[in-house]
Amino acid sequence: MEKQGCEIEALDIDYNIFVRKINVNPFGIFRRKPRPEADQPVKTEEESLKLEDETGNKVKHVLKGVTCRAKPWEILAIVGPSGAGKSSLLEILAARLIPQTGSVYVNKRPVDRANFKKISGYVTQKDTLFPLLTVEETLLFSAKLRLKLPADELRSRVKSLVHELGLEAVATARVGDDSVRGISGGERRRVSIGVEVIHDPKVLILDEPTSGLDSTSALLIIDMLKHMAETRGRTIILTIHQPGFRIVKQFNSVLLLANGSTLKQGSVDQLGVYLRSNGLHPPLHENIVEFAIESIESITKQQRLQESRRAAHVLTPQTTLQEKRSEDSQGESKSGKFTLQQLFQQTRVADVGTMNIATEFTRDFANSRLEETMILTHRFSKNIFRTKELFACRTVQMLGSGIVLGLIFHNLKDDLKGARERVGLFAFILTFLLTSTIEALPIFLQEREILMKETSSGSYRVSSYAVANGLVYLPFLLILAILFSTPVYWLVGLNPSFMAFLHFSLLIWLILYTANSVVVCFSALVPNFIVGNSVISGVMGSFFLFSGYFISNHEIPGYWIFMHYISLFKYPFEGFLINEFSKSNKCLEYGFGKCLVTEEDLLKEERYGEESRWRNVVIMLCFVLLYRFISYVILRCRCSQRSFKTTLA
């Protein structure tokens, strides 16, 4: 018998969200207003109004006492109109959200959220994938991160999954997205499903898997899910908005939601019986699920009428008996066909004999931190070298700008005017290099979405991502530093010492790495590219203002002096000056037959000395580590707060 899934049961689920009427600071991810804990639910309207007075927020009841059950070998479809609470219920079943009241059980035991993420797959409505990786590479990297298997077995599993997903024809094609040409939308959705089933989960949960697809592609997706349920015994739960007639036939069970409440769960035929019991008669060849969704208003009115009659004791004993018989008849058809189907499903479950056995899976990650870092570094490197806008354009930009600057400042004279021009050159180089990496911000924002999705599934640690992200750019930035330093240094005629050239190249490398770290830090913080671009530009401008180039640090007001010491421009700027003018007896200005100003005098005037050469390098490295650490902390906060949902009005 094939591997079996798990029985998922939700009992009396209540879930509330807060609607804020005020503008929310997009950077306030560390500050959250008080919210009710799981053991302190908001149960009544009176309590809701009280909570609104205390916090300034309104409480919206998304789910109200929802109960449902999903079984192995079956597909449970959660249907209902927009705003019915389908996605919220799905995230609760996927252990991504915590309800205020109610419980979720896995194989009749309370769900262990950390463990459940290891044995389940959750496919979001949006395809969050790297567009420049091929289909096979995407699945292979996912397998490496989630499975501890030899390389041959990993490749064999990926090939088998590609065949199961029907993606052999596009296995070597790039995934693509809105801006990168790649595979079709239906194929991309199948890749998203493949990423979540590569570790062979017992439960597969999908949010609107047919959204945005044509009818043929949507049917292919559902047929594939049906095949997974019937051949591998998986428990499959999905939400769907407007299922077609052929799609509905594939569902074993349908959960009808309306206004956050359960109207009915059962087979499609049981749903038809339920509709008729409420006075609705769907046409013979009508799509029953669509008819039920369209008739929700009539159903709720009928239910409210029945509840009011019960409350007023209007029902006669005969009517009560008839309603009870009608409810009992929903569990079976007139011919007994569905009872036989249920017995057949129960027999298959009993054959496996694991329904009442606790699911035991390790909480640990599949790989060590070192292995995760190596895998992620490999994946990052593929993306960098395939991103022409980042790799080729940056390469041409750095080499071209180095040559142009070298020609503009060609062979500067060794006099006071030449010294001033050198200082201006260093200031421009700093401004250019520290502000030219903002174009990488969209790439980091895309990576952040993928990081949050993958870490929420337990694929790897956030710390491994932070280390890999820091390592992968080192060789790339070193190449850029050499391409820029070589022409500008020798064409301008800076310090002819080869060691001075190496130190200059080191400073350029650290400047590029510092700028990269700043962009990484703010990409973890800001909500989008527009805000990120504005914030980074403002921060860099402020740092340049207090660098010491426009105004000496001795003349900066005391209440602003802290900006001078945290400026990213200060230490490399000092490093350039020390590297160029230190240990040099060149005379810059003569008067009355003797030297009036030497290069050493310029350094003494600004109180720069040779002892600061390596101190500045160390401080620049500390800035790199600081911004990388801040980005790691922010990402950890984002990933840990992913389980909470707040609606902004």
From Swiss-Prot:
Membrane-related topology note: Multi-pass membrane protein
Cellular component terms (Gene Ontology): membrane
Pfam families reported in the protein's UniProt record: ABC2_membrane (PF01061), ABC_tran (PF00005)
Cellular location(s): Membrane
Keyword line: ATP-binding, Membrane, Nucleotide-binding, Transmembrane, Transmembrane helix, Transport
Keyword Nucleus: no
Domain of life: Eukaryota
Annotated region described as Disordered, given as residue ranges: 308-336
UniProt: ATP binding residues: 80-87
Keyword Membrane: yes
Main location: membrane
GO MF annotation terms: ABC-type transporter activity; ATP binding; ATP hydrolysis activity
Gene3D superfamilies per the UniProt record, alphabetical: P-loop containing nucleotide triphosphate hydrolases (3.40.50.300)
Protein name: ABC transporter G family member 5
Organism: Arabidopsis thaliana
Gene name in the database record: ABCG5
